[in-house]
Amino acid sequence: MRIVYLLLPFILLLAQGAAGSSQALGRKSDCFRKNGFCAFLKCPYLTLISGKCSRFHLCCKRIWG
């Protein structure tokens, strides 16, 4: 029974961190507004990461316009 008291704060910290995690990700429309495009896992050559479209999709932007 003593371990429950030790685990409770840890569980509460995990729940608190997971509460706002979905808001941290951007959306496709935000990426397109920044003149970018969504790419799976990594951006192509001569592009930079400018954000996230979803968990596995990055928002990429071309280096030269």
Swiss-Prot record:
<keyword id="KW-0295">Fungicide</keyword>
<dbReference type="GO" id="GO:0030141">
    <property type="term" value="C:secretory granule"/>
</dbReference>
<keyword id="KW-0044">Antibiotic</keyword>
<keyword id="KW-0964">Secreted</keyword>
<protein>
    <recommendedName>
        <fullName>Gallinacin-1 alpha</fullName>
    </recommendedName>
</protein>
<dbReference type="GO" id="GO:0042056">
    <property type="term" value="F:chemoattractant activity"/>
</dbReference>
<feature type="disulfide bond">
    <location>
        <begin position="43"/>
        <end position="60"/>
    </location>
</feature>
<dbReference type="GO" id="GO:0031731">
    <property type="term" value="F:CCR6 chemokine receptor binding"/>
</dbReference>
<feature type="propeptide">
    <location>
        <begin position="20"/>
        <end position="25"/>
    </location>
</feature>
<dbReference type="GO" id="GO:0006952">
    <property type="term" value="P:defense response"/>
</dbReference>
<dbReference type="GO" id="GO:0005615">
    <property type="term" value="C:extracellular space"/>
</dbReference>
<dbReference type="GO" id="GO:0060326">
    <property type="term" value="P:cell chemotaxis"/>
</dbReference>
<dbReference type="GO" id="GO:0031640">
    <property type="term" value="P:killing of cells of another organism"/>
</dbReference>
<keyword id="KW-0732">Signal</keyword>
<feature type="disulfide bond">
    <location>
        <begin position="31"/>
        <end position="59"/>
    </location>
</feature>
<keyword id="KW-0929">Antimicrobial</keyword>
<comment type="function">
    <text>Has bactericidal activity. Potent activity against E.coli ML-35, L.monocytogenes EGD and C.albicans.</text>
</comment>
<dbReference type="GO" id="GO:0050832">
    <property type="term" value="P:defense response to fungus"/>
</dbReference>
<keyword id="KW-1015">Disulfide bond</keyword>
<keyword id="KW-0211">Defensin</keyword>
<feature type="disulfide bond">
    <location>
        <begin position="38"/>
        <end position="53"/>
    </location>
</feature>
<dbReference type="GO" id="GO:0042742">
    <property type="term" value="P:defense response to bacterium"/>
</dbReference>
<comment type="similarity">
    <text>Belongs to the beta-defensin family.</text>
</comment>
<dbReference type="Pfam" id="PF00711">
    <property type="entry name" value="Defensin_beta"/>
</dbReference>
<dbReference type="InterPro" id="IPR001855">
    <property type="entry name" value="Defensin_beta-like"/>
</dbReference>
<feature type="signal peptide">
    <location>
        <begin position="1"/>
        <end position="19"/>
    </location>
</feature>
